Amino acid sequence: MTPTGDWYKGGDEVGAPSACGGGSALMTLPEKNLGYKPETETNRRLRWMVGGVTILTFMALLYLVELIDQLTRHSLDNNGIRLLKTDVLWGISFAPVLHANWQHLVANTIPLLVLGFLIALAGLSRFIWVTAMVWIFGGSATWLIGNMGSSFGPTDHIGVSGLIFGWLAFLLVFGLFVRRGWDIIGCMVLFAYGGVLLGVMPVLGRCGGVSWQGHLCGAISGVVAAYLLSAPERKTRALKEAGTDSPRLKT
């Protein structure tokens, strides 16, 4: 998938007189320096609007779920990810939208808005793929190692912080893979919000612990997502570095 705003090149076919007299021969010329065609201002605004609406809608969903949870005396909190329980699909599906309390959700709000918006700017399709991969793969891995290193006994993993760590890892690694401004953006986000992520860890509702397992699994899933979703850009870069991109034979 190519994000909105990628550029394209063009070239011309040239007919030149043949050295043998008569007719013409096709020539191989480097592409004209037509420059890159940036996205229009309208497309840029639309992309920002779609990104903003997407992440704000998701955030509104989280607050709605927490409101329902509060009104039902935390009846939803038991639906998180629990180690090797047979209701694994249920836990993986709902754990990221559940939070122990309002403080837990508020602590995750700013990193979620910033990181989610940055990924959404790359396109709605890419945002959906990244989120789905971190959500499913990170949740599945947490289901496998959920109690590792825990001194509280069986744990119930809830909260969107695993997804946040996945998004952060994706931004950093994706930028390194494609060698574009994403790595700079990712590093800026890391320095700006890394302290928030480390200092305000999500709290599990009943055991008072930190789901470092969910954070770790989410981050690993983000790295995997970055590798898989950067394949088109990496392939294009490899072709350019191999010298197969220009000059081209114009026919």
UniProtKB/Swiss-Prot annotation:
GO terms of molecular function: serine-type endopeptidase activity
Subcellular location: Cell membrane
Main location: membrane
Chain segments annotated as transmembrane: 48-68, 88-108, 110-130, 132-152, 158-178, 184-204, 209-229
GO CC, alphabetical: plasma membrane
Topology class, membrane: Multi-pass membrane protein
Entry keyword set: Cell membrane, Membrane, Transmembrane, Transmembrane helix
SUPFAM superfamilies named among the record's database cross-references: Rhomboid-like
Family as reported in the entry's similarity comment: To M.tuberculosis Rv1337.
Name listed for the protein in its UniProt record: Uncharacterized protein ML1171
Natural source organism: Mycobacterium leprae (strain TN)
